[in-house]
Amino acid sequence: YEHPHAFYRGQIYQKIWDYDGSSVSNKQYFSQSGQDKIIHEVFFKDYTHGFFLELGAYDGITGSNCLFFEKSKNWDGIAIEASETQFVKLEKNRSCTTLKAVIGERVEEVEFVEVIQGLTQMSGINYENYSRSLAIFDDNEKNQIEKRTVITKTVDSILREGMVVDFMSIDIEGNE
């Protein structure tokens, strides 16, 4: 269920963040709409040396919900990205552990669609709800995609036994 005014509320929050984000004090934050600032101020204001798990880390900088914690609060973590193109950038941009993987509920073979040109943040697993994204790619010749079969990994298989995750960010463009 989505509230009928959610779209407009999101646009208003984005405009506020765009304006607020122009201030010098907000330059340290990296998320798309100030999520990292809110998470920091509400939950982790004085918390240093935490541990994050970032699913959908993209290039490690653009829209990152965890980079602030890594750079400013001495956190460590694991940044995971499925796109081969973006993973190369992620490895260069982050000092935390990076992992190229497609995360799933269970280990299985899936088709991964990588957008290598155009809407590159829209790469994802090709399943029934992804058909709308594929239609968008087909409608715009600027988008170039590559499909490949991959084996998913589970979050449990990535984390060591007893590992405590303080903050988990899942940013996979509506495919959560």
Labelled PLM ranges:
Residues 1-176:
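Phosphate/nucleotide-binding beta-alpha loop and adjacent structural elements of enzyme active sites
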